[in-house]
Amino acid sequence: MAQLYFYYSAMNAGKSTALLQSSYNYQERGMRTVVYTAEIDDRFGAGKVSSRIGLSSPAKLFNQNSSLFAEIRAEHEQQAIHCVLVDECQFLTRQQVYELSEVVDQLDIPVLCYGLRTDFRGELFIGSQYLLAWSDKLVELKTICFCGRKASMVLRLDQAGRPYNEGEQVVIGGNERYVSVCRKHYKEALEVGSLTAIQERHRHD
């Protein structure tokens, strides 16, 4: 039986690398995969999933208006799909998460979703909220804070490198805008108004 998987983490935990490896594993066995990524995130070029270690794959784009079940069913009828993989799945809508569950339940195709659990305010993304609620399997991909603890929070930095937790939920950026930290240092960095000061303090403790 196919299942719906949600692989979640903070930033820079290797989600895209894990997705590309999973897709490769299917293809190596002669199976066909379809990869989706969010249209909104074009840091590495539109229409592909890229990892920080240099791997990449062509990808279909989804936005808030995409009818994922209809798209996948139509393509599956043309040529059998053995696995659907979705990067940046935090940007899915509630309806799209439901449609992906229908891909699993009605078409018997496994769906592997990779994304962030929470935003820079510590709030769940809509897509992540419903994947946490409806997935068959939840898998945490771990990354670490500068202190060595598990990083479960994401700090957003302004142009001067100062952390803040107000404003639009979605601002596309890489390492220069977002930093993964543990909960303790997330709170301390916001209180002090400086991630650098917290890192320096930790080094001298």
Swiss-Prot record:
Keywords of this entry: ATP-binding, Cytoplasm, DNA synthesis, Kinase, Metal-binding, Nucleotide-binding, Transferase, Zinc
GO molecular function terms attached to this record: ATP binding; thymidine kinase activity; zinc ion binding
GO biological process: DNA biosynthetic process; thymidine metabolic process
Entry keyword Ribosomal protein: no
Active site: E88 (proton acceptor)
Binding site for ATP: S9, A10, M11, N12, A13, G14, K15, S16, D87, E88, C89, Q90
One Pfam family linked to the record: TK
Chain sites annotated for binding Zn(2+): C145, C147, C182, H185
InterPro entries: P-loop_NTPase (IPR027417), Thymidine_kinase (IPR001267), Thymidine_kinase_CS (IPR020633)
Similarity comment: Belongs to the thymidine kinase family.
Oligomeric form and interacting partners: Homotetramer.
NCBIfam families: PRK04296.1-3, PRK04296.1-5
Protein name: Thymidine kinase
Gene designation per UniProt: tdk
